[in-house]
Design a protein with these regions (language model features):
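A short beta-strand-turn-helix
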Residues: 18-36, 59
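Short pre-active-site segment immediately N-terminal to redox-active cysteine/selenocysteine motifs
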Residues: 34-36, 40-44, 110
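Conserved redox-active cysteine motifs that mediate thiol-disulfide chemistry
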Residues: 40-57
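Short, internal strand/loop/helix patches
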Residues: 82-120
Length: 149
């Protein structure tokens, strides 16, 4: 049951979380059949400065194969997130959850924390933190899921 809960909550939380464009958070139908990497981040998070270039690279390299990266910002002040994004542009979907609905539901205790979700909507892994040495392992996990079908 919990395996599909993350995607469902991402959709249900759309009333309190907005995409960077101001549109509702997500369209569940658009995620069907995709491998989804959900990353919780904040402007004050030092490792997030390292993860954003990696996520840009992964989205660019594997997006056409079915990877969707969604970065969920938890800053209380939208301006803090905007300042971070000016310094570290995102070429993937960014949503804002200043009320912390999603991190609370998933027990996120630190930033960044990521979840890797397979094409069937099941959470396959959870990863706390981000170090440059994590890149290869995370990329391999994503590639395995992309080629599982």
């Amino acid at each position: 049951m919990r395996t599909r809960v993350l995607l469902l909550l991402l959709v249900l939380a759309s009333h309190s979380a907005l995409a960077a464009s101001g549109d509702p958070l997500l369209d569940l139908a658009a995620l069907k059949g995709q491998v989804v990497y959900v990353d919780f981040w904040a402007s004050w998070c030092a490792p997030c400065r390292e993860s954003f270039p990696w996520m840009n690279h992964m989205q660019e390299e594997l997006g056409r194969d079915g990877l969707v990266i969604i970065a969920v910002n938890v800053d209380h002040e939208h301006s803090d997130a905007e300042h971070f994004l000016r310094e570290h542009p995102a070429r993937f979907r960014v949503v804002f959850d200043p009320d912390g609905v999603l991190p609370e539901k998933f027990g996120v205790r630190g930033m960044p924390t990521s979840f890797l979700i397979d094409r069937d909507g099941r959470v396959q892994s959870r990863h706390a933190g981000f170090r440059l040495t994590d890149r290869d392992s995370l990329a391999q996990q994503i590639r395995v899921l992309l080629h599982a079908h």
